[in-house]
Amino acid sequence: MPKKNSPLLPKETTPTQSSVDTSGSSNLTWPVSEHTIRRPLWARLLGQILDPWLDLSIEPEHCVQYPEHCVQYNDGRPIIYVLEDYGLCNTLILDKACRKTKLPSPLIPLPGNPLQRKRAYLALSRRSSSNSLIPNQRGGKTHSDSLANLLQAHRIRDTLDVHLVPVSIFIGRTPDRQSGWFAVLFSENWALVGRFRRLLAVLLNGRNTIVCFAPPISVRQTLNEGLPPERTLRKLQRVLRAHFRRIRETVIGPDLSTRRLLVDNVLATEAVREAIASQAKRDGTDLSETWRKAQAYAWEIAADYSSPVIRSADFLFSHVWNRIYAGVLIHHVDSFKETAPGHEVVYVPSHRSHIDYLLLSYCLYQCGIVLPHIVAGINLNLPIVGTLLRKCGAFFIRRSIKGNMLYSIVLSEYVAQLVAGGYSLEYFIEGGRSRTGRLLQPKGGMIMMTLQAFLRQPRRPVLFQPIYIGYEKLIEGTSYLDELSGEPKKKESIWRLFWNIPKVLKQKYGQVVVNFGEPIALNDVLAELAPEWEGQALNENEKPAWLSNTVNHLARQIQTRINSAADVNPINLLALALLSTPKHAMGEADLIAQITLCKKILLELPYSNRVTVTPHTPERIIAHAEQINILTRVHHPLGDVLRVDGDNAVLLSYFRNNVLHLFTASAWVACCFKNNRRISRIALIRLGVGMYPFLQAELFLPWTEDQFAQHIQQVIELFVREGLLLSAGDEEEDPLTRNTSQTDEVFRLRAISHSLQQAFERYYITISILVKNGPGTLSASELESLCQLAAQRLSLLYASTAPEFFDKGLFRGFIQKLRELNLVWPDTYSKLLFDERLDTSAKDAQVILGRELRHTIERISPEATKPAPK
């Protein structure tokens, strides 16, 4: 920036008095030296009070390059300063800047008083009269009559030629971190703030104030364009506003606080206006009443982005994360930053905790990435909390919008405005937090809105960025246990939030890892699935035949990419090992050996190049789990036993499920030897490929069937090297065998198999109930309910299981896959039909499940209640 002695500064000359013709017959120049007419007493007194708090950096032209032939400030013509908005602090700062640069004072009126005010400055907008600490962005700006009076004075007096000098004032543009969060909160931004807030800004950040003088604008030249009076006024106001906006963008960055503008644009769209008219006609109400309802919806939804609040939140949460977490690790963000420029970015993270919202925003901010507009459930729109989340970029949507067409269209148009405006987005396609640790089946609503918005205005290419968030301990762990035990979900409450904050701050939650997955370019997806689309914009109501399929493909691809960027932390490895035993306990040596085997599988047979694995040794992993109170050590003369007690065992199933997909192939191979001592390679691979579509649908696996077969082959080779299996040869027909005795190798093989055991039990329950009831008896929903009941009963009779074992959603996914593969299909009454192929699948289960377990499942499989004969 130019310094005080910069050539851009006006020459240090003092205006001198010249003759004035009050009739307007002579050329008007600056009339009186400041030494002749003193500034008002109140200005001198307040200026002395404010001076110690101010340190001005003067920028006559700032960083915008203007032509060298611009009229200088001291050419003798009268000057009127133009501020962006009124305010006593602004007036005193301007006066000090003028004295510092030897320019005429804004507090001394011009001869003839063309402004009809006792001053030589005007403002485009009035500052809010509110004394609130919160910036007023909804209140409208009101322009003064001074500019209109000045133009009228020029029309009356032909020789009058006043120059307007726009002056931009920025208090606390970039306060240092050492200044504290309170100073950051009151730094300069785009909001029109009240008097009290401006005063606090001066007291806290006044020593970092920038005053930007722009080149003068000749009012006479503007009038000489010959436009009608109203158009001249509007044009001059528009030019000045554009100037102030350009300077503000240069100094403090672009305006992201566009809530009012977005709401106005949403309500002005053709789709919303038609929806308002349709709703009013349907309800028999007045158009204005329905319009107000649509406006209320828009304000309920819209974010209220505020840079000072975001900077304050960063300052606050830096301390919070350091207190409760042992670090936040971010992987693969550099490759994302190389790919993202020029794209409309949509962040699509996994959803495990309410902390996801805050944590990801914190990580992006720390990486120097502009925060996105984040979709949040309306349940989080709590007093105080909701306001803060809005100001950090959150916009709120209702959980269910079915049947509310007006709300649906307002929401859709709001998203379209964000996409068209180039704002990045963030939403969780699972719809809600996963209570089981698995990725939930995706919901395509937000993807559909994003895709439709892009197709309407395909300006910038869209990039979906999958993100995996991994925790070692959940803040919501206790509430998840209650919900999985059958208790209803507790409604979010501001009081419960405040009550829980001290408890949370006393706990240690281990380390958090944020992994950026491989991004998905929307244009590449459209080129594959919609080759007939050639980049042309579509109409609002146009829905091509390929749209729904594209949304579904995108949703599954996002979940698959999230899983392909998983992080394996110490708790994941402990969960895989300990939950494979009946009492969730192992000797220390056995636990170390099992963790070592799991790490070897991950490192020697990498799932993808974005999966990260903890570098800690098994011994360090065990010590870490003891530190955060997950493991209990029981001392014994024959060797210590490490176990998980009570609720921790159920919570560990959550962390096992986080990484279940990484061990799919190895768990499949191990499962085949749980109840069989010998099996050929070709049979093992054939059965695995037959089971793969169901595993892929449930776990979002990335391979094709051929790739999965190759992965199984690699697992077999690793198990042979580790001594877990014995091979009679390398041919497909050659048998693979395991030891008959209860060796350490057999123990480790059984432990690996346990992670997929419950999935196969669910599959067999579904097939058993279908076969027992016969074709044409059960609908899909009836089958789901019976499967859930059978799984609950099996859990009570046979062995304790994790709560997700009888999750209806998992059964629903399996039944849906059966339908996709045409193994079952509905009749005209929506009852499921099947043929002998289902019996073949049941026979294949004999390879995986033991005889006793199969018999128990067949015995408890319920039959549908048949209606009593008439």
Curated annotation (Swiss-Prot):
This is Glycerol-3-phosphate acyltransferase. Belongs to the GPAT/DAPAT family. It is an enzyme of class 2 (transferase). The lineage of its organism: Bacteria, Pseudomonadati, Pseudomonadota, Gammaproteobacteria, Lysobacterales. The keyword Membrane applies. NCBIfam families: plsB (TIGR03703), PRK04974.1 (NF003441). It is a peripheral membrane protein. It is found in: Cell inner membrane. SUPFAM superfamilies: Glycerol-3-phosphate (1)-acyltransferase. Pathway: Phospholipid metabolism; CDP-diacylglycerol biosynthesis; CDP-diacylglycerol from sn-glycerol 3-phosphate: step 1/3. The keyword DNA-binding does not apply. A motif (HXXXXD motif) lies at residues 351-356. GO terms for cellular component: plasma membrane. The HXXXXD motif is essential for acyltransferase activity and may constitute the binding site for the phosphate moiety of the glycerol-3-phosphate. Pfam families: Acyltransferase, GPAT_C. SMART domains: PlsC. One of its GO terms (biological process) is fatty acid metabolic process. It catalyses: sn-glycerol 3-phosphate + an acyl-CoA = a 1-acyl-sn-glycero-3-phosphate + CoA. Residues 1-27 are annotated as: Disordered. It comes from Xylella fastidiosa (strain 9a5c). Its main location: membrane.
